[in-house]
Amino acid sequence: MSILGIVVEYNPFHNGHLFHLKKAKELINPDLTIAVMSGNFVQRGEPAIMDNYSRAEIALKAGIDIVVQLPVVYSVQDAGGFALGSVWTLSLLGVTDIVFGSETGNMKLLDVLSDILIEEPTVYVKLLKQHLKTGLSFPNARKAALKDYLKLHLSDFAESIQEIERSNNILGLEYLRAIKQIRSDITPHSIVRTGADYNDPYFKGRFSSATAIRKLIITGQWEKVKQAVPDYSYAIIKRECALKKCPVHLEKMGRFILGLLRRLDREDFKNYYGFTEGLDARFVRCSRQCGEISEFLECVKAKRFTFTRLKRLLMNVILKLSPKLIEQSNKQGPQYIRVLGFNENGRSHLSRIKKKLKVPLLTTPSTWKRVMYKAISGDFEIDQDLFQLQMKRDIMAADIYSLFFDDVKVIKASNEMKRRIIYIRG
């Protein structure tokens, strides 16, 4: 059986995503398509523009058979942790092929680079340290070290060096690395992205970036939004915004975040993943000097810290993501598979494989404790403590996210534990 897996955020689902999905299906001709999707907080260190269930509903209407949620312990990590959690989840579900978008179709180059990252040759490590000493951020230092290593030791790829630069190529590289790291049988494929660059903030018509579309939603430019997304995506975006559940964005969270930070002293930051190189002192000082989150980020920013890294650190504080929890999750993998929605084809598949899975399926959040205890007494390969921590962080993420809806009544009614799975019939 051919099962296509894709890693998505759909923040929000737009015409470029639809193009990728169609091309992926044409390439694999799968019997089933599964998407692992970030929940309410995404990899760029921000809240999603809409909640997890509304984005899953759009994905199902686009033709995906099963949508599962990537636990938040992975969704707000850097490219490596994000890819690891995503690939691990898809592997647990029996996915045979993964297709990702990149700015290059050069799978041979990505394969070579992923080997370098896994094996970490002495020369590469030395080059990386040299670039870090110049004050470059880790992602930029790593790109520079990889480019230098290729020039020195793999001259056949010298002409392809510039392809390393683009963000989607780095993410594709991490998918390959994750597949090798967990020794998965998944076969990776890449298709060239189309349309605007991932971070392009400007409206470019039908193929605008998610960044540009989010700005249009926030500013209420609905005619332009309509051009950039499929009709079913537009209808659900409009519905969620009419319900005052959209848009959610980082600026809305600003005072909440600054309030949390102002309660902390430098030593408190050791409890949160990723705080190194004096960042604790910067966070303490800037949180007390600034009144908006954009101002805070500018205050903390330095050459070696990207804005995205700083925003992820904020998420680690908000969601109480400790070094131990992240390291343990990256070592042991997801402890459950949380299903957000399926169609008839997806439902049938889950019924067939449910008893063969190594981790339990979770379809109703309110039953998670019952599912966990049943799993422990059964044949599942899970860690009870890690299961609880991963699940509690997902629920916490949803509870915090709902605070930023624009209607108090909606906030009160938004209980993640009561959410029902989305089932698209027919």
Swiss-Prot record:
It is found in: Cytoplasm. Coiled coil: none annotated. Gene3D superfamilies: HUPs. GO terms for cellular component: cytoplasm. One of its GO terms (biological process) is tRNA modification. InterPro entries: Rossmann-like_a/b/a_fold, tRNA(Met)_cyd_acetate_ligase. Keywords: ATP-binding, Cytoplasm, Ligase, Nucleotide-binding, RNA-binding, tRNA processing, tRNA-binding. The lineage of its organism: Bacteria, Thermotogati, Thermotogota, Thermotogae, Kosmotogales. This is tRNA(Met) cytidine acetate ligase. One of its GO terms (molecular function) is ATP binding. It comes from the Bacteria. It holds the Pfam family HIGH_NTase1. Belongs to the TmcAL family. ATP binds at residues 7-20, 101, 168, 193. It catalyses: cytidine(34) in elongator tRNA(Met) + acetate + ATP = N(4)-acetylcytidine(34) in elongator tRNA(Met) + AMP + diphosphate. Catalyzes the formation of N(4)-acetylcytidine (ac(4)C) at the wobble position of elongator tRNA(Met), using acetate and ATP as substrates. First activates an acetate ion to form acetyladenylate (Ac-AMP) and then transfers the acetyl group to tRNA to form ac(4)C34. The keyword Nucleotide-binding applies. Its EC number is 6.3.4.-.
